[in-house]
Amino acid sequence: MKHNRMRRLLAGVTAAALLAAPALAAEDTAPAPQMPDAWAVGELADSYAMGLVDDNYTTYIQSTITSEQLSAMTGIVADKLALLELPQRAADTEGLVVDTTRGGVMNALYQEAAAYDIDGVEEGAAAFLTGLGVVRGDQAGGLNEDRPCTYQEAMVMAERLILALYDANDAGSRGLLWKAVNGDNTLYLLGTIHMDRSNVYPLHKSVRDALDASQVVSFELDLNDQEGMALLAQLQAYSDGTTLADHISPELYARVQAAAVSLGMEPNGFDAYKPWALASTFGVLSLQDDTTGANAMAIDVYINAYAVNAGKTIDSVETYAFQGGIFDGLSAEYQEAYLDASLAGYEGMLNGEAADEAAQALAQAQQEQIAAMFDAWKDRDPDALAEVY
């Protein structure tokens, strides 16, 4: 898991491929990918951001959900609902059958909501969930509660339940969102932080509504630009026959090797990469913590997946060649110092109290700053953000 996350960060495309496009099988004998139905595509970005699906969802999304998967899913729902800090109630869920049928999944999700004093929760699973729009039934209005439930169906129910209750309580991360209107033209400007932490998902309904209302969504970089990402990958790696060890001190190289091992890689796993590429990646890793989602979906990556799955036109204000060229043009001395500082932050985060005092102090300062930044971002408080950034 850590190794995969590191590779995605180096590629600059963490979860950017969470789009409803056909996957290519590695071999002709590999099972055909399980793609989401059209009606569920719009639910993918939020489901992934909240950990309801992972990178391998095309191997199971159309299969009947297992008991283990359902348990993990309801655990995520429970954690998200707990963050709302709603008044609790003595839930009467005795006799509810929890299994892998649609009705059983509905009961499992209902149990998590029934622990709180929510309007309509006393009406029972079916009435409560249909009232919220979590379960919508087939064209004839049937809920098909006895039918086996696919993972896709359970995922959508769980995602809709979380969003419905967050929206009902005016909750969710508001982000730094501005709106400008000129005649018939409306422009939304959303400032993002290129990370996932502080339980940032789900985003507030106002942010999702702004996305829904937009025709064009423009980013710093186009996360769907495969040629640009390939160019960035070339800039990040040595092509002259040298390796990282030839460009940094032996002491720093030994620390990079230790970091590679901590991420489940071979000691020489980073040999191909330039110091600036590793520095930016360790910088992101050092700021993640136990509030980072399982998929570590950066906010801009979520916005991209949401927009692409909704059929929005995607644009960008910079190119990979421009941005990568800036980093690649840094002096060798600056790159080494940049890597040293970023790696120190990662080591402090990784080693905790076992790190030396300087590393602990650096890690703590970084964590406090990024936590304050996310708090300000979630509260839509630009003044608070300016104080800590």
Region spans (language model):
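Short, low-structural-confidence N-terminal segments
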Residues: A26-A30, A168-D184
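Gram-positive cell-envelope targeting signals
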Residues: M1-E27
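Surface-exposed patches in mature extracellular/periplasmic domains of secreted proteins
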Residues: N56-Y60, A168, P267-Y273
